[in-house]
Amino acid sequence: MIKNFKRISLLIAISFICSKSYSQSDEEELPPPNILWISWEDVSQTFGCYGDTYAVTPNIDELAEDGIVYQNAYANSPICAPARSTLITGQYASSYGGQQMRVRSVPDREVRLFPQLLRKSGYYVTNDGKYDYQIVFDKDIPFDRESGGNYIWNNGNFRAPWNGRNGDQPFFSVINFTRTHEGHSSAINSGWEDKVEDLLGEKAHDPAEANVPPYLPDNRTTKECIALHHDNITYTDSLSGIILNKLEESGLAENTIVFFWGDHGWGLPRGKRWLYESGVKVPLVIRVPDKYKHLLRDGQKPGTKTDELVSFVDFAPTMLSLAGVSIPDYMQGQPFLGKHKKPPRDYVYVYRDRADETYDMMRGLVTKDYLYLRNYRPYLPYAQTIRTMERHPSMQDLREMHKADKLNEAQGKFFQYPKPVEELYDLENDPHNINNLAKNSNYEDELEKLRSRHLEWMKEINDVGLIPEPEFDMMKWPEGKGQRTGRPYFESEYRNYIDGKIEVSIQCPTSGASIVWKYAGSDSWHLYDDQPIVVGPNQILQAKASRLGFYTSKIATYQLGDPLTKTKDPSANHVPWQKKVNDQLINKILELKSLDYQKGDHLEAYYEYLDAEETPVRYWATMGIRNHSNTEKEISRARDKFMALTHDESPAVRIEAAHGLCKWGHYDVGRPVLRNALEHRQEAVRLYAMNVLDKMDEKPRMILPFPKIPLYTGGDYSHRIMCRIYKRLGIKPKDLEYATPDQVQNIRNTYNTIILDNLWDYNFK
């Protein structure tokens, strides 16, 4: 790989010695560097360059020999879409609602994705098709595949991502590899493991030699899964080598900064989706050509390792810093390379909320010495059921061994219930995060320091994860659906035609929107750059706009002779959610939730918050009372309160109250509340109710037949839970997992009680 890179680097180094070095003026005259991202899915630091002797990763290892290996690089979220959302915005996803899996968040109007800023500064920006940013609605954003033009990216060509640019135009290209994804490492007995072994030959991994972490059983199933995962890593390493060689063969390597990184930890149990090191610590290797070495930190040299703490929220400002572009104030990360680099950070912050169909809420922070975790829903077990995770053979094996009581203490921790409210781990002596020190008196000072810092951070960013997802969705879309960007309009300072032509500018009534335009009949949309556009006879100018998180506007048209009329912003009367979430609300919720870890019985304190005006406060208070009411007297008092709460204006509060009532045997009151929630127009309300039913074992039978409700369009998550419930109740499907839209419609025409895209032969009438 990179056959000539070292030789060329050596020649350049010699020439530098002869000429002493680049002067400051030379550095200022350098063109902006190209930047190439090579991202892999679901990988921890299981590479040769990180000291993993089981790994066969020659291409990434060689990249590391010429680059910097970051030993303390972290994804801020342990699951793909929230992690990528953080990457692309430079903001913590939990500050704008992107921390849940598969959501449509609405950032502030001023926010731009960093590739937009690079493109505006003159970069040619490409992405090979992996977006997953949790912000956009329509296919036009971020990439209009039909037109070839778009609001963010120039194109999405994988084979030659930097082709298509003008001359020496600098480029930023993203190439994503998916073979290491959790789904592929679970493909035991699918035929792929045999195919990849044939492809790798002697590089294939022997399961017997696999290194098994202490939190997983050291048995054949685990070893086979780890071996297949490493085979996929080696296979993807070869693909990465092809890209790097192509970069060199194009003559671009000496002008291109290369980032290799993984989107979060590996896909085995207790990795992906959890905030342990196995879930958030990722590989990061950065190669900077010698001519751009001034963009590194002082003392950084090729072929070295650094223990500097960096995280995904830092990537966006770092890209802008490397390109010499100003960093917007709204970005919450800090650049660690480039013109605007900041001193190394002391903390990395991590978060996890809903993972696929299953709710939880965890926050944490990492230093070089400790990992601190805060479980905001400690009454939930770690090992909740998540469909994708349950398909993994190692997860199936783990559950079987747990049922048979064959797990040791470290392995069985994954099934601990309830979870500890706080966790603290010594990273040097306990790299796998097994021994929780939170209740060890020797670490009280450290625990208090990290707890306080995590609370300060949540307040600094106004962490909206404290707001139940159904309530937050209603803050975003009171009418139950997203806002549409206003249709662009045209302006001109020249009312008289010049040579039969006119220059027009394009405006959008929705602030924060980006505009694209084209002439009618053209296949390509162009990003509008605020420069006038000439419209001549027989030409029709078309324009459309999109604000991040909004639907794309309707197309506007202009031709000579048309009146120049301003359009209106459809969202003008909509109060943005940012004005509904304030410091007072966040502080009040955190004050309430501090009862979780305070010593003593605080049941009475939860009641003090039950009549709060703020819906999220009432929600958390209801949950606290449900989980702390254990005696007959306590349950009797709570029952009376919860009866009244089933009429609360908030669906989330009603569902939580119904949860408690069903828990205490009052199905006659709880059941109608849950049934009504399943018919709610908001997807998140339905999913909240489904999560309650999923925790009830045989009790969901009390709610059958389920009402007919709309499909969950955000990722079929309600459908997944429905499938689990029916299977648990012994209802045998013909094909419970997959159904086409036509099959769904046919079934609905046959059975009035069928609700989601399921197929079965059971009559519920």
Where are these regions (language model features)?
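Residue-level detector of beta-strand structural context in well-folded domains
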Residues: 361-363, 423, 504, 531
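C-terminal substrate/ligand-recognition segments
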Residues: 420-434, 461-462
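Formylglycine-dependent sulfatase
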Residues: 2-9, 15, 21-417, 431-452, ...
